[in-house]
Each structure stands twice: as structure tokens, then as C-alpha cells.
Design a protein with these regions (language model features):
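PRPP-associated nucleotide enzymes
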Residues: 1-314
Length: 314
């Protein structure tokens, strides 16, 4: 078994290798002045079981293309099996045709991964679970919930309500509420556009409660901060947010700085610089991904990785 990494999140890749007990594979990735990428595998991979760690986070197109080139290089070097480890799956929000003449880009990415020579995909907290069905190869879909739970249980939170910031996240919120033995609520919203919310309402009892907002990803933080604001007006004692993938562009960072969210709990699936003025706790999923890689390599079951106290995450 050998583990390689693109440039998207080498910090996570090194942590995964440490948890497995192996060295990160030697690879030369060089950008050309015209924007093209050159890749050379610097060690023998003939007959090897290969894992490539590359979240397709922003810059999404660059990281995707880099991944395809690495896969092609490994395939042409006679690797036995190639598993693409995508801690974050880019384009996951484009998972359906919701208006005329638009693509289903999440499916296109799946097609391109298979065409490039991948034999298996390992990913985490897909924005839309049906993306697993876009592939004609095995997909192992992990969840950050067990890592989040281990952190949250140490807080010994009382009067807790788990809140989904929209209708789409109710399944995730329900799993958290069952595990944490907490009440469940939802913020129902009506959108003007993909980036603008017209109105919001809270369904559930919030007054005097400690609130935990849960979501799979945030970029502009509009949904999170708007939900937190209305929860505070409804009498929430405190508001924390658990988000698996915190992509956080400049708009999102500024919104969080001005928000009433007391703590944002996220993971290291995507790499980002330190952010001043925002209370962010970053939990590592390196151990979880590392264990999955070991089990896939040994052809063992990964079923137990979907489970944590309170039941399954799926």
C-alpha cells in the first residue's frame, strides 16, 4: 500500500499517514507558467494498492484537474488499484437538474473520475447522498459525526436543542439529536436566490436552550449566521455550529465575525489559513480516514466506521 497526496491538503495527508504508520509517497507536482500542471511519481508503484488524498475544494477546477493527472500518472505506472480519497467532494451541490438547460456536474465529476482510471472512491459527508449512485465503482461514504460527537460529549451540554438550518439538513440534525439525547428543531427558510434568503421561521422550542446548528458545509456562512440570528431572537441561550466542511470565503469569514455564533466546530477536510476574530475549533478526521484506508487495503469491512454512540450516522 502507498499513499500519495495532491497539493489541496497535504497537512491532512501527512496526518493520515501518521495515523496509518506509513510515509507519504514521493511525487513531484510542478505548475507551468501557462497554468498547466506537470506530475511525476518519484517511486515505483507497479502492482501497488494506491490511495490519493485530494479534497476537491477551492480552487475546485485546479484541484480536480490535478487529481485527474495524478491518477493518469499512477495508472500508466501500472498501479494495481487506485482509490481516490476525497475528504471533500467538489460540485456536490450541482446534483440535480433543478432548472432548464443546466448540467448535473456532480455526475460529470463521477464520470470523469471513473474515466481517469479510479477503482474506488472514499469520501466524507457528501452534500447529497445520492451522489454515491452516480458512480459505477465502489464508494465508501464516511461521516464526521463520530469525531464531532467525541468533542461535544466532553462539553457536557445541558438544555440542548439540535437545529437544522434548513429542511435539507433535517436527517443529519435528527442523527445528532438522537446521539446527544437532545431536542430537535428546524429553521425553515424561503429563498430569493442561491445567495439570498427572503424569510425564516423556527419550528421547535428554543427559548432558554443551548442550540447546536448542524450542517454539512458552509462557504458564505449566510445560512448559518441568519439561522443563528433568528434563534437568538427566539431566546436561545447560546448558539454553536457544527459544520463538516468549512470552506469559508471572505464573505463567510466577515459574516462569522459579526455573527452571534459562539463557536464554530469543523474538521480539517479542507485546508484554510488561521482566521482572526472567529472562535473556530478544528477537529481532525485523519484517524477516521486512516482507519478506512487500512480496512479497504486489507479488504475488511468499514461498516463500523459509520456507527457511534446512539446509532448509525446514515
Amino acid at each position: 500500500m502507498k499513499v500519495f497526496s495532491g497539493t489541496a491538503n497535504q497537512t491532512l495527508a501527512l496526518a493520515i499517514c501518521k495515523s496509518i504508520g506509513c510515509e507519504l509517497g514521493k511525487i513531484n507536482i510542478t505548475p507551468f507558467p501557462d497554468g498547466e500542471t506537470f506530475v511525476k511519481i518519484e517511486e515505483n508503484v507497479r502492482g501497488e494498492d494506491i490511495f490519493i488524498i485530494q479534497p476537491t475544494s477551492p480552487p475546485t477546477n485546479h484541484n480536480l484537474m490535478e487529481l485527474f493527472i495524478i491518477i493518469d500518472a499512477l495508472r500508466r505506472a501500472s498501479a494495481m488499484r487506485i482509490t481516490a480519497v476525497l475528504p471533500f467532494y467538489g460540485y456536490a451541490r450541482q446534483d440535480r437538474k433543478d432548472q432548464p438547460r443546466v448540467p448535473i456536474t456532480a455526475k460529470l465529476v463521477a464520470n470523469l473520475l471513473v474515466a481517469s482510471g479510479v477503482n474506488r472512491v472514499l469520501t466524507m459527508d457528501l452534500h447529497a447522498q445520492q451522489i454515491q449512485g452516480f458512480f459505477d465503482i465502489p464508494v465508501d461514504h464516511l461521516y464526521a459525526a463520530p469525531v464531532m460527537y467525541d468533542y461535544l460529549k466532553k462539553k457536557k451540554l445541558t438544555d440542548l436543542v439540535v437545529v437544522s438550518p434548513d429542511a435539507g439538513g433535517i436527517k443529519m440534525a435528527h442523527a445528532y439529536s438522537q446521539t446527544l439525547n437532545a431536542e430537535l428543531a428546524i429553521v425553515a427558510k424561503r429563498r430569493k436566490s442561491a445567495t439570498e434568503v427572503e424569510s425564516m421561521a423556527v419550528i421547535g422550542e428554543i427559548e432558554g436552550k443551548n442550540v447546536l446548528l448542524v450542517d454539512d458545509l458552509t462557504e458564505t456562512a449566510g445560512t448559518l449566521t441568519s439561522a443563528a440570528a433568528i434563534l437568538k431572537t427566539k431566546g436561545a441561550k447560546s448558539v454553536m455550529a457544527c459544520v463538516s466542511h468549512a470552506l469559508l470565503n471572505d464573505t463567510g469569514i466577515e459574516r462569522l465575525r459579526k455573527s452571534v455564533i459562539d463557536e464554530l466546530i469543523t474538521t480539517d477536510t479542507v485546508q484554510r489559513p488561521a482566521i482572526d476574530g472567529v472562535n473556530i475549533t478544528t477537529l481532525s478526521v485523519a484517524g477516521l480516514l486512516g482507519e478506512a484506508i487500512k480496512r479497504i487495503h486489507s479488504n475488511s469491512s468499514v461498516n463500523s466506521l459509520f456507527e457511534f454512540k446512539g446509532g448509525r450516522t446514515s
